[in-house]
Amino acid sequence: MKKICIVPFTKNEYSLIEFLPPEYVITSLITPMGIGIEGQDISVMRNSSDIGYQFTNSITNGINNADTIIVTNIEITEKKLYEYAFQALLMAVKLGKDIICFLPLNDDEKEVIRKMCECFGGMCQFIKPLTPSHVDKDAKVQLYNFHVPVIYISEMYTNCGGYEALIRIAEAIRCKGYKPLVLSNNPYNILLKYHSINFNDVTSLENSVVEINQAVYLLSCKVNPDIIIVHLPNPVMQYNRQNRFDCGVLSHVISQAVPGNGYLYCSLKTKDFRFLKAITDTIEKKLDCPLIGVWIGNQILDPASSSGTSLVNLPADNISIQSQTDSLSIYNAFSIIDQNSLVSCIIDNFLNLSYGVI
């Protein structure tokens, strides 16, 4: 087993530690004191499920006690936290550690790190998602067809439970003996032995459908899956005037490149089921595929956020929902029974039937 340390640890790595393969044993989760990204630091994980780990702000102790160091994906625009991550990377290199680096670095910086690893006896693996714009495209083929069912995971708001739903469903389906092709723009997908694809990285909007289609097709040829599950990178619809995201443009492009057979909608906590029915009906038309159900977690918009874009968790035991209402299938993200019911629904409706035969 590999003893690993994750630095810097933020909300974005929460699902990573829950689903890491058994060969990894976490020894340290390092989070800096007084440095963070609003809405992403560990304070917003209050009322999350217990994970059984303690946080530390000591880079030295955390890295010393681990065999493998995971340096997380921090955007360069988050200057202080990025510098913290880079300093942790340099320390790990000088201690001769094995490093899995998700930190965005340019080619010159990567070369410097490689040479330092040679000097200090360590090794650094730089992780980058697949980019459709870099796939060798077959000019003779416009679009490939997919002969297995395709399911989308869509969200009401960015990072409101879609990635957790994706991995839970994928793991459950895999345990049932099926082979899923799991696609997300989350770079940590690679650590979980799935695939990461940067849907935003296309040469142009007019080429985006073909480029994404061919990138996913090449992955499907490699994996030979029973089902394709795609985590849509942006919400299909704007949340409000302040949070428009991309107004569903990228999700529409993906739906044209990899046509879906059904979608799961991940919602913020709400009891307004009429609103959910209206919005899911609209998304159904935008994605051109039926709703499988609504996955409701315990997150709401943080009323104390200065940016108005952060989420906060409510106590999970406050979630009280009906499983069926207004012709919607509702699934509680914290209910094992509901999760099993959702997976059974997907298997019965998409995998147990002879696909494409009526």
Where are these regions (language model features)?
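ATP-dependent carboxylate-amine ligase catalytic core
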Residues: 22, 26, 36-60, 172-251, ...
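Long, basic/Gly/Ser/Thr-rich N-terminal segments
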Residues: 1-126, 295-358
